[in-house]
A protein has these predicted regions:
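Sec-dependent signal peptide recognition
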Residues: 2-12
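Short, solvent-exposed, Trp/other aromatic-anchored flexible loops in extracytoplasmic proteins
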Residues: 105-123
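Extended low-complexity, serine/threonine- and proline-enriched intrinsically disordered segments
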Residues: 65-97
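Extracytoplasmic/secreted proteins, especially bacterial periplasmic and envelope-associated proteins
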Residues: 117, 189-196, 231, 235
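An ectodomain-focused feature that recognizes extracytoplasmic/extracellular
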Residues: 20-77
Length: 282
């Protein structure tokens, strides 16, 4: 692989003579892997340029991102391409997508199908690359990823993508657990929603607080509503703790009927005013 990669870079010089090239050194190509239930990342440092990164965050699209510390773009466009490997007996390059760039842009990003195609191509020995005009160069620059040592990391990266949680932090950051009239038992759907919270909290060490707030409608006496509001928050807290969420992360408040979501004058409105609200903070 190393000899083939070296030969390929050599053969490319006449084709891209008008472009200043940035690429990992053949003998110094490294990969950095992040493998968690909420983030998968496979990145490669590129000397004198920055990094190239395949990645996905839970609940978000798969992406390919080039980030530069040294070569901000001119206003124009960046072309994402895939270059053929030399053993395929072809000097052709395949365009993936062309996107507009702003003056001074340092991050070049594609996602979804195009990014996944780039990963498939590099797995087959081809070379993902970008072209654009840099503020610090009189000619177009070309940035290539290397395939060297890729197979040492790719299987773990693919496994991480398979195991990635399917929902984002934003989807569980604000959650409403509803209750029936004068009840504080959790239904099956509510338990499923809370287990999503549990799994995310257990996977994300940056979460610092889970705030619970119990509510009631204005049906019944205040003393009874106070107990009901407390019990609704408590049953959610206990469910979280029973499934492994540390008590130190959880705060509890009881608002009774003081902060209604809808008017208490209708049955529908009162039904919406009986939740325990959950807000999660990083």
């Amino acid at each position: 692989m190393i000899k083939k990669s070296f030969l390929y870079y050599f053969l490319l010089l006449p084709l891209w003579v008008q472009a200043e090239q940035f690429q990992p050194a053949i003998t110094d190509t490294t990969w950095e892997l992040i493998n968690t239930p909420i983030e998968c990342s496979l990145s490669q440092p590129i000397r004198d340029f920055g990094t190239a990164r395949f990645g996905q965050i839970a609940g978000h699209p798969f992406s390919l991102t080039y980030t530069t510390n040294t070569q901000p773009s001119k206003k124009g466009s960046v072309t994402f391409e895939v270059a053929e490997a030399p053993w395929q007996n072809s000097e052709q390059r395949q365009d993936l997508v062309i996107i507009q760039t702003k003056q001074g842009q340092r991050v070049f990003h594609i996602e979804g199908v195009n990014a996944r195609q780039a990963l498939n191509h590099i797995n087959e020995g081809r070379f993902p690359t970008i072209f654009y005009l840099s503020q610090h160069s009189n000619q177009e620059i070309n940035v290539l990823m290397s395939t060297v040592h890729l197979q040492d990391f790719l299987p773990k990266f693919e496994t991480c993508l398979i195991d990635l949680l399917t929902y984002s932090f934003e989807e569980i950051q604000h959650l409403t657990i509803n209750f029936e009239l004068e009840k504080y038992e959790l239904g099956e759907l509510e338990k499923v929603a809370l287990m999503r919270v549990v799994k995310f909290v257990q996977a994300d060490p940056s979460i610092r607080k889970i705030a619970l707030a119990g509510h009631t409608d204005n049906h019944g006496k205040k003393r009874l509503n106070q107990a009901l509001s407390d019990n609704r928050a408590a049953v959610v807290k206990n469910f979280l703790m029973d499934n492994g969420v540390p008590e130190s992360l959880i705060t509890v408040a009881s608002h009774l009927e003081l902060i209604p979501v809808m008017s208490n004058k209708t049955q529908t409105g009162r039904a919406h005013n009986r939740p325990t609200e959950i807000e999660i903070f990083r």
